Amino acid sequence: MLQKFEFHKTERKIFIKSVITAIDAVRPKDFYFPGEMHNFWEIVCVAEGAAMATADERVYNLKKGNLLFHKPMEFHRVWSAEGTAPRLFIISFEAESDGMAYFRDRLFTLNDLLLEEFGGINAACRRAIELFDKGDTSEYSWQSNAAAVGLEAFLLRLRGEKETAYREDSRYAAIYRQIVSYLEDACCRSVTVEETARACNLSCSSLKRIFRMFCDKGVIEYHNSIRMRMAVKLLGEGKSISEVSEQLGFSSTSYFHIAFKRATGVSPGKYFGA
C-alpha cells in the first residue's frame, strides 16, 4: 500500500522577476546624481563614507551600512556628503509579489555581516548582467537564477531586522517635505509657484531656493511628475485615457498625452504595451 502524504503548498511572498541594474562604485566627493523616477524597485546601500538621498518628500542622511528602499514611481536622487567619496551598492529590480509592500519607505542599518552579504549579492547580479551582455544565454540563465534567489533570501532575512527610524536632520529638509506634501495633495489639478509659496508661508524665491537644495527639478516640473505617477496608477487600474486626463485636471487629452510623454519618454499606450 502506498503511503499517503500531505503536501503543504508554499507561498512566494517575494519573487524577483528581473534585475535591471547592479552598481558597485566609489563616487567622488562632488558626486551629484540629479534624480529619476521609474516603475521598478531600487535599493541604495552605503558601503563606505556618507551620502544624502531624497525619496519623494523625505530627505535621508545615509551613513555606512544604511540601506534605503525606493519603491516604484518614487522620485529619488543621491549625492556625496560630509566631504567623503562614498562607496555605493545599488540594485534595481522588478518584483511581482505582494510581500514587497513591506519594504515601502523603509530604511535599515546593516551590520558588517549583512553588508558583506549584500555586497556579494550585488556582485552576483553584476555577473549575471555581464553574461547577458555577452550573449552567453546558457550561463546567464544559471547566474541570473542564483542572483535572484540570493536577493530574495536577503530580503526575507531583512524583514526580520529592525528598521531604522526616519528623522529630518535640518529645518530645510522639513520645509522641503512640506512643499512636496502640498504638491502631492494637489496632484489632481494644476498649481503655480505663487500658490505653492503662499501655502507654505514662503516667498517665491525662498521656495525655489529650498526646493533646489534637494531636487534638480523645478517646482512645477516636479508637480507634473507626481501627476504622471498617479496617471500610471490609474491607467494600470483600467481607467481610460480620457477618464485619467479629466480626473487629474488636464484641460484636454492632447495636453495629457504631451505631459505623459515628456515625463516617461513614451505615450500612455506604448508605456503599458512595453
Where do the PLM segments sit?
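Generic protein-terminus/edge-of-domain signal
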Residues: 1-63, 74, 82, 109, ...
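Solvent-exposed, amphipathic alpha-helical segments
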Residues: 49, 120-135, 175-186, 230, ...
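Short hydrophobic/aromatic patch on the recognition helix
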Residues: 65, 206-207, 211, 255-256, ...
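Ligand-binding loop in jelly-roll beta-barrel domains
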Residues: 73-97
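Double-stranded beta-helix
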Residues: 95-114
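Short, Lys/Arg-enriched, Trp-marked, Pro/Gly-tolerant hinge/linker segments that flank
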Residues: 108-119, 134-146, 152-200, 213-225
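Terminal helix-turn-helix DNA-binding modules in bacterial transcription factors
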Residues: 181, 190, 194, 212-257, ...
